[in-house]
Amino acid sequence: MKRFILSIFLLVSCLALAACADTEANAEQQMPKAEQKKPEEKTIHVQKKEDDTSAWIKTEKPAKLPILMYHSISSGNSLRVPKEEFEAHMKWLQDNGYQTLTPKEAYLMLTQDKKPSEKCVLITFDDGYTDNYQDAYPVLKKYGMKATIFMIGKSIGHQHHLTENQMKEMAQNGVSIESHTIDHLELNGLSPEQQYNEMADSKKLFDNMFHQETSIISYPVGRYNEETLKAAKETGYQMGVTTEPGAASRDQGMYALHRVRVSPGMSGAAFGAYIESMK
């Protein structure tokens, strides 16, 4: 008798549970779409590629780009610009709407005659001095500026020059590390094979150190010849910069681009007038 009563109880319970389930299902089907639970969607962040120039401005004439040339951010000779003056230069660029470029962006601007902003500039430093990290880098971060340091391969970690860790930190924060050869020798005095090795070894060093395609080289002391230009192309660089004065343009040759030397003694206003004269 007890088993019979227990069986009846279990049967009634099952029927009640089934009825509840049907009620919940019907209620969810009748719920307005806005109230129905949706599977959680994952947000996908799409990072705009550096080589996407679809929104860039087409230039009416072949693009011209001021490539600024600094060395040490200190005082003492014509290659050294004091920190206070350097900051005045960066402030002027920001106040006047200039966009600073990476080497890749500079290459695209010069080869496609398109630019990401009405006013663009490429900031470069030769040799890779410690003060580029201690004094220039904080200013660049303060004003949101990109820059490029042409580092001498053999000088990494040596006195007054950047360490690998310093360069890697900067590389994560808008500063590109590019080639100034291995030994900083005047290339026009070397054999074609020596020139090739200086450039190839430097590119390999920085490619491996920063997991990048090192794309631009600065010729030591601005010395170069036709063999230099040939070697720069053969070793895989996209651009080479010289110390020839003026704004860079494609008609100079992508391996013989001019630069704008920034000397000490320039106030922000004087610097600005100098840059504006390059248009």
Predicted regions and their residues:
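Short, well-structured secondary-structure segments
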Residues: 67-69, 78, 99-103, 141, ...
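Bacterial signal peptide processing site
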Residues: 21-23
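Hydrophobic helical h-region of N-terminal Sec-dependent signal peptides
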Residues: 6-14
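Substrate-binding clefts and substrate-entry loops adjacent to catalytic sites
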Residues: 178-193
